[in-house]
Amino acid sequence: SAASDVYKRQVYEDFGELLFTHFGLSGPVILSASAHMARGEAGYTVRIDLKPALDEKTLDARILRDFSAAQNRDFENSLSALLPRSMIPVVIARSGIDPMQKVNSITKQQRRALLETIKCFSVPIACKAPVEDAIVTSGGVKVSEVNAKTMESKLVQGLYFAGELLDVDAYTGGFNLQIAWATGRLAGLSAAAKEFQKPEDAT
């Protein structure tokens, strides 16, 4: 989920694919969440459930099972079946548990801290990617100023709009491409039809 740090409210929640990259967070869920975060100047925090298919009770049982199988190992060597290798050092640091602590000495409170880290992995958003990297942008000509049947401007005769020129943006998944194709085709056909309807110059 994504939440505003200033207004203390959740602005978006979804289930789907997310990527940890060298520059930050990406993936379909983040692209959709960014549509909400881009409209405000307040700081945001993304809270990620790293094991969304497991509720807390089931996840705790899973952790106990993994710990039982690795009770004589160091904590840092007990999570390979639970988390991707690159995530393990980060999750350990967030949990506050000594990576060299033996698994058989980990307390219930420490296990709870690990569970909470996995179920609510917080990432503060420091900045947004530059507009040059955007998949789609918000803003543009108000749709109330455009004839939806022709895509012609209601304010300027003979002027047509399509795609991202319009103040229309949708979640990722091909919707923005469909908007561009559909409005572009309609605008082109409408402009051509209007041109052919012009009376011929008198000779």
Task: Describe the residue ranges of each PLM region.
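An anion/pyrophosphate-binding glycine-rich loop and adjacent beta-alpha core
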Residues: 4-105
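Gly/Ser/Thr-rich beta-alpha loop segments that engage phosphate groups in nucleotides
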Residues: 26-29, 141-142, 165, 172-176
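Predominant activation on well-ordered alpha-helical scaffold segments within soluble catalytic domains
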Residues: 30-31, 112-115, 119, 181-189
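Domain-scale detector for complete catalytic domains at protein termini or as standalone homologs
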Residues: 45, 75-81, 87, 126-127, ...
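A glycine-rich dinucleotide-binding beta-alpha-beta segment and adjacent secondary-structure elements
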Residues: 89-169
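A conserved FAD-binding loop/helix module that cradles the flavin
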Residues: 168-196
